[in-house]
Amino acid sequence: MGEVEISALAYVKMCLHAARYPHAAVNGLFLAPAPRSGECLCLTDCVPLFHSHLALSVMLEVALNQVDVWGAQAGLVVAGYYHANAAVNDQSPGPLALKIAGRIAEFFPDAVLIMLDNQKLVPQPRVPPVIVLENQGLRWVPKDKNLVMWRDWEESRQMVGALLEDRAHQHLVDFDCHLDDIRQDWTNQRLNTQITQWVGPTNGNGNA
């Protein structure tokens, strides 16, 4: 297992998803360009899935299929899974998180499982509030922190704080919202634009 890089876009949307539903478990998928052997796995985007129907397999299948098709159109693969437990002091992956991450790893062996650390999930955390796990055989184990890269951690951290202050998380749409009202955009293009506009002036371009 090589390096993994987490983009601002992927990190920010994951945090906003957890912030929108602070008393619920939430989960989602990471997308990445398929890396060649030995290349860094770059998680460029994430798709928030559920906040109330996490264990319903039919809805999960629908979501996985739609995200897979949508990602493929942009040359991306489902390369990881994130999960935040409802309990503030629980950062351990439960049976559901392990099952979904395992399913993704069947198709993409280098997939990562990221658990959000709710105790560190504050507007501007000093260190990334995540635990990155990799698949080793039948077990998910913490990935070497030296192999976890951030496109720009300082910028990502500040961006989450600013967007929370602007209440941007209230505009985030997960698959639950979309299934309740199919007019709602689970790809979050409006929010993506808001994030990339923030990144652009800092980096000189619109890439997250």
Swiss-Prot record:
GO cellular component, one term: endoplasmic reticulum membrane
Membrane topology, record value: Peripheral membrane protein
GO biological process: protein insertion into ER membrane by stop-transfer membrane-anchor sequence; tail-anchored membrane protein insertion into ER membrane
CDD domains to which the protein is assigned, alphabetical: MPN_UPF0172
Compartment annotation: Endoplasmic reticulum membrane
Domain of life according to the entry: Eukaryota
The name this protein goes by in its record: ER membrane protein complex subunit 9
Known partners and oligomeric status: Component of the ER membrane protein complex (EMC). EMC8 and EMC9 are mutually exclusive subunits of the EMC complex.
Pfam families noted in UniProt: UPF0172 (PF03665)
Task performed by this protein: Part of the endoplasmic reticulum membrane protein complex (EMC) that enables the energy-independent insertion into endoplasmic reticulum membranes of newly synthesized membrane proteins. Preferentially accommodates proteins with transmembrane domains that are weakly hydrophobic or contain destabilizing features such as charged and aromatic residues. Involved in the cotranslational insertion of multi-pass membrane proteins in which stop-transfer membrane-anchor sequences become ER membrane spanning helices.
Keyword Glycoprotein set for record: no
Matches recorded under InterPro entries: EMC8/9, MPN
Alphabetized UniProt keyword annotations: Endoplasmic reticulum, Membrane
Name of the coding gene: EMC9
Similarity-based family: Belongs to the EMC8/EMC9 family.
Domain MPN residues, every copy: 4-139
